[in-house]
């Protein structure tokens, strides 16, 4: 039509005439140029160098070259996920704090992340354990192993400064609990460092974990090796880059967490992107404590506390009101730990009951979360500081009241006594020096060797041995050493029959010859005659020599098997001695009374003796009570024997402080013994040491306690002696 218009404008209608009047035809389309011929890309062949140029690559380095070249043919894809690391940091700190105070060792971030990777695959994402292979005819196949075997990339620096990458394997990692995984991982690392890896140690990996984050790499896409379907990369644990230079107090106030980036590089032929994404989500969930991940880790390692839980921060715009409420909560938390911190202390060597966190000791009860741990609060002078981060406040309180020592003292009405105890335990380093540790070990050696000799030499004879409570010997030793160094004139000890022979020998100084003669029926004719266990009733006088060279006279009062009958006798003997010395209020003779837990709670003479302890006519300036807490009375469990929570509750009638201590921590036992003596000297009052332990052989050596307490004695039979445990710790 346009051509018709050009030939004769009147041949078209007026409307088309108007349209074509200023119409311009588009430029003629140009022909599409022919596509260039494809360029054939020849594979790049490394230049052939003369033999004198460069260095030959041999051994493990040559295998790395071969593996890297083989990895080029794998069609991989990579997913990333950034995970908040706050909870990971907090729970790891608790774990390592406990391990550092007990058997030693350290759990790394890689241990926890590696275990989370294994758990995520085995529980939720088994597809990530698949790998690609071909049959003999070249047909594609997929292999799905039943268990996860984790290869761990280890960067090893050689003596010449060069680095080598080794990937040993934790086999069947999905069948291990965390303790087993941790042990297998550490054994593998020991082999790497000792250069003792065998070819078998490199075989069988189904998944590989690499952690370049240890050298600061934020995230990585590692190479996937043939025969595997997944390699997981772990980036650095740090604040996001935009916050790295921020003030730590500001970071805490804003609730900014460190993050860790985890990558999943997978074989796209057998693993799909959605599966990789779900896998990484499960890893994040586990590292945030979902499904009791950290609780399981704590139980596997024997950590006797509840794991910290993930919670959302509460930090509104109206921060002043919120912080005021939190400040009040922190003050309440400090007081509650002083009153009830002993409830979560690690006191039971057997740990046959699951730990539980009372609501009043849980910061979450007061609206405090992990995000408040780095925020500063007023402390009221706790550990000599006016302002501390909440994490530091909890650290001070739990070190003082919730480790292997638990203290009951807030029932005391005198604020000076309360303040004195706080000054002795809050923010004070619990470590003993090496000489003290060696001396404690010597005392434990003597206690255990004595019992073992009697058990071997006099088979079948009753001796009411101290096995399970050997720490009582270092306790008595520490009290008497402090008394000797303080210049006291003497001490009188009263005790029941359990452990009496050990105390006679290792504390009072009775000779082995005398003890052995009594086992062989050669009883001293001057002693009170009897039959059966008469040797467990006898008293003895001796001299205790402290390491300083100072000495103190010690008398162990005779006592029949009426347990607490000796209590008023000992106190009366001490009062008579003090009156004879004729130094009013000097109280230079120290009474020490040992008790069984059931007898201390169950016999009325205990309460009667306590009740008279501060009456002017009967005062002796304070008795040190040592309760050998077997956690059972003959065959009766605590819940069937008393109404109180502790066997020592009766001592509260005189407002005596009570120090509960784990008998399998002899260092803590000695610290408590010294503290108890110092309290007695300072306030001239009774004080109680509750050594929580167990009886290895029942009421006496002729009993089989597993009939009445099978679960308890299954634990006891698995338990090594306190001497063995302390030797390993040292």
Task: Place the predicted regions along the sequence by residue.
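Extended, charge-enriched "interface" segments that sit outside catalytic cores
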Residues: 23-44, 311-471, 488
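C-terminal catalytic/motor cores of large multi-domain enzyme assemblies
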Residues: 8, 15-18, 25, 29, ...
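Short acidic, glycine/serine/threonine-rich loops at helix termini
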Residues: 217-220, 243-245, 348, 501-508, ...
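A glycine-rich phosphate-binding loop feature that marks nucleotide/adenosyl-phosphate handling sites
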Residues: 19-22, 203-209, 298-309, 350-355, ...
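Phosphate/diphosphate-binding loops
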Residues: 375, 379, 383, 514-525, ...
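Cofactor-binding active-site loop characterized by glycine-rich and histidine/acidic residues
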Residues: 492-655, 659-663
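Active-site pocket-lining segments that scaffold enzyme catalytic pockets across diverse folds
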Residues: 64, 449, 453-513
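Hydrophobic alpha-helical scaffolding
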Residues: 6, 50, 54, 269, ...
């Amino acid at each position: 039509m346009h051509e018709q218009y050009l030939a004769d404008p009147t041949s078209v209608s007026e409307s088309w005439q108007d349209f074509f009047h200023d119409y311009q035809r588009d430029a003629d389309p140009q022909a599409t140029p022919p596509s260039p011929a494809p360029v054939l890309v020849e594979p790049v062949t490394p230049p052939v160098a003369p033999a004198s140029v460069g260095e030959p690559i041999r051994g493990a380095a040559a295998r790395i070259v071969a593996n890297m070249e083989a990895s080029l043919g794998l069609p991989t894809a990579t997913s990333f996920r950034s995970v908040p690391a706050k909870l990971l940091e907090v729970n790891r700190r608790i774990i390592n704090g406990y391990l550092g105070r007990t058997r030693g060792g350290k759990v790394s971030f890689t241990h926890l992340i590696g275990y989370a990777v294994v758990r995520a695959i085995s529980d939720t994402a088994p597809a990530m354990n698949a790998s690609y292979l071909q049959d003999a005819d070249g047909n594609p196949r997929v292999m799905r192993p039943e268990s996860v075997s984790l290869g761990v990339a280890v960067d090893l620096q050689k003596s010449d400064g060069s680095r080598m990458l080794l990937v040993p394997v934790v086999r069947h990692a999905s069948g291990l609990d965390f303790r087993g995984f941790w042990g297998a991982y550490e054994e593998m690392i020991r082999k790497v460092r000792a250069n003792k890896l065998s070819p078998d140690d490199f075989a069988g990996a189904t998944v590989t974990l690499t952690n370049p984050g240890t050298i600061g790499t934020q995230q990585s896409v590692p190479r996937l090796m043939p025969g595997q379907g997944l390699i997981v990369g772990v980036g650095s644990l740090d604040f996001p880059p935009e916050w790295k230079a921020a003030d730590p107090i500001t970071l805490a106030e804003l609730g900014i967490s460190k993050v860790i980036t985890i990558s999943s590089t997978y074989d796209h032929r057998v693993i799909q992107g959605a599966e990789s994404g779900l896998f990484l989500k499960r890893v994040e969930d586990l590292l945030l404590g979902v499904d009791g991940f950290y609780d399981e880790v704590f139980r596997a390692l024997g950590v006797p506390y509840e794991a910290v839980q993930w919670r959302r921060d509460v930090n509104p715009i109206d921060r002043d009101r919120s912080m005021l409420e939190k400040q009040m909560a922190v003050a309440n938390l400090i007081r509650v730990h002083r009153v009830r911190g002993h409830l979560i202390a690690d006191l039971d060597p057997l740990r046959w009951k699951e730990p539980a966190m009372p609501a009043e000791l849980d910061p979450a009860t007061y609206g405090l979360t992990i995000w408040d741990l780095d925020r500063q609060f007023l402390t009221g002078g706790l550990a000599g500081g006016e302002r501390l981060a909440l994490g530091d406040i909890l650290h001070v309180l739990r070190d003082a009241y919730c480790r292997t020592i638990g203290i009951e003292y807030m029932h005391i009405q005198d604020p000076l006594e309360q303040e004195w105890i706080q000054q002795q335990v809050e923010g004070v380093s619990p470590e003993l020096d090496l000489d003290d540790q060696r001396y404690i070990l010597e005392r434990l050696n003597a206690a255990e060797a004595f019992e073992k000799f009697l058990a071997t030499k006099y088979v079948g004879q009753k001796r009411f041995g101290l096995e399970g409570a050997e720490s009582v010997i270092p306790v008595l030793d520490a009290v008497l050493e402090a008394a000797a160094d303080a210049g006291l004139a003497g001490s009188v000890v009263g005790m029941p029959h359990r452990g009496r022979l050990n105390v006679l020998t290792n504390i009072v100084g009775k000779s082995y010859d005398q003890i052995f003669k009594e086992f062989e029926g050669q009883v001293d004719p001057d002693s009170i005659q009897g039959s059966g266990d008469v040797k467990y009733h006898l008293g003895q006088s001796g001299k205790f020599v402290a390491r300083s060279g100072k000495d103190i006279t010690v008398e162990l009062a005779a006592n029949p098997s009426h347990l607490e009958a000796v209590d008023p006798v000992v106190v009366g003997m001490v009062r008579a001695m003090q009156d004879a010395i004729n130094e009013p209020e000097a109280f230079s003779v120290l009474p020490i009374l040992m008790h069984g837990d059931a007898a201390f709670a169950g016999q009325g003479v205990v309460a009667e003796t306590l009740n008279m302890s501060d009456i002017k006519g009967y005062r002796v300036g304070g008795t040190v009570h040592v309760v050998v807490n077997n956690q059972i009375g003959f065959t009766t469990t605590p819940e069937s024997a008393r109404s109180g929570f502790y066997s020592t509750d009766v001592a509260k009638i005189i407002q005596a402080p009570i120090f509960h201590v784990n008998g399998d921590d002899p260092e803590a036992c000695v610290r408590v013994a010294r503290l108890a003596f110092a309290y007695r000297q300072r306030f001239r009052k009774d004080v109680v040491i509750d050594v929580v332990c167990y009886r290895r052989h029942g009421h006496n050596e002729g009993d089989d306690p597993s009939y009445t307490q099978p679960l308890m004695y299954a634990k006891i039979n698995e338990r090594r002696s306190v001497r063995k445990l302390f030797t390993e710790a040292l």
